[in-house]
Design a protein with these regions (language model features):
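Metal-dependent de-N-acetylase/amidase catalytic core
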Residues: 2-6, 80-238
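Active-site rim/loop-helix segments in enzyme catalytic domains that contact anionic ligands
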Residues: 1-95, 220, 232-235
């Protein structure tokens, strides 16, 4: 099965938080989408690996993805190794996605910026004919970096106003992370609990204001954008 869009992230729930609305929008547009979670988030404060896999499966259904896979790499121990690159490259060759979404290449969490480099290099080596890996050589056409976890101005933003509520439901499918039992609420971590709804809204509204819509998700690309019609370009200048 070939995919049009594959989102790669270090932990279950990262895709939902950074590009969930975009995944929903692309699936509704008829594109075949998928998610590759690199780890099970087993070193996190809340939940078990099995619980998070179950939550990821539920969230994936809400997002409408055709496939969701977990590589089971060690959480908090990601590195740009040949072994990990080959594991991701094998998935790239299997699904042949035209577009890949990666985390932004800078950030607070080592797994996030490591996943960005790891994903990029895996996409590259997947296209090397003589690389020691099963399958036919294939390299994605476009790589996007989700801007949500980084203090960076996005290259472009995707209007997710019509998909915001469904994205919200996908995020809240991670009950162990965002709606834990009271007995598990003693420890505080960076990901919000009571403040989650407000933070989700503020961030989506922030990107939305940039393009004149209610809610949006931001992305960064390293290449210059091409346009063939400067008269009908979107987003007002004033």
């Amino acid at each position: 099965m070939k995919l049009d869009l594959l989102a790669i992230a270090p932990h279950p729930d990262d895709v939902e938080l950074t590009s969930g609305g975009t995944m929903i929008k692309m699936a509704e547009a008829g594109y075949r989408t998928g998610i590759l979670d690199l780890t099970q988030g087993e070193t996190g404060t809340r939940g078990t690996p099995q619980t998070r896999l179950q939550e990821a499966a539920r969230a994936g259904k809400i997002l409408g993805v055709a496939v969701r896979r977990n590589l089971g790499l060690p959480d908090a121990h990601l590195s740009v190794s040949d072994e990990y690159k080959a594991a991701i490259a094998a998935v790239i060759r299997e699904f042949e996605p035209r577009t890949v979404i990666l985390p932004y290449w800078e950030g607070r969490h080592p797994d996030h910026y490591t996943a960005a480099r790891l994903g990029y290099e895996a996409c590259f080596v997947a296209g090397l004919k003589n690389y020691a890996l099963a399958g036919i050589a294939y390299r994605p056409f476009k790589i996007l970096y989700a801007a949500a976890y980084a203090d960076v101005r996005p290259t472009f933003a995707v209007d997710i106003t019509k998909h915001y509520e469904r994205r919200r439901r996908a995020i809240l499918a991670y009950t162990s992370q965002f709606r834990p039992p009271k007995r598990d609420r003693k420890s505080k971590v960076e990901l919000p609990l009571d403040e989650l709804e407000e933070r989700m809204s503020l961030q989506a509204r922030h990107y939305g204001r940039m393009i004149g819509v209610k809610f949006a998700e931001g992305f960064v690309v390293k290449e210059v954008f091409q346009t063939d019609d400067i008269v009908k370009m979107p987003v007002r200048s004033m």
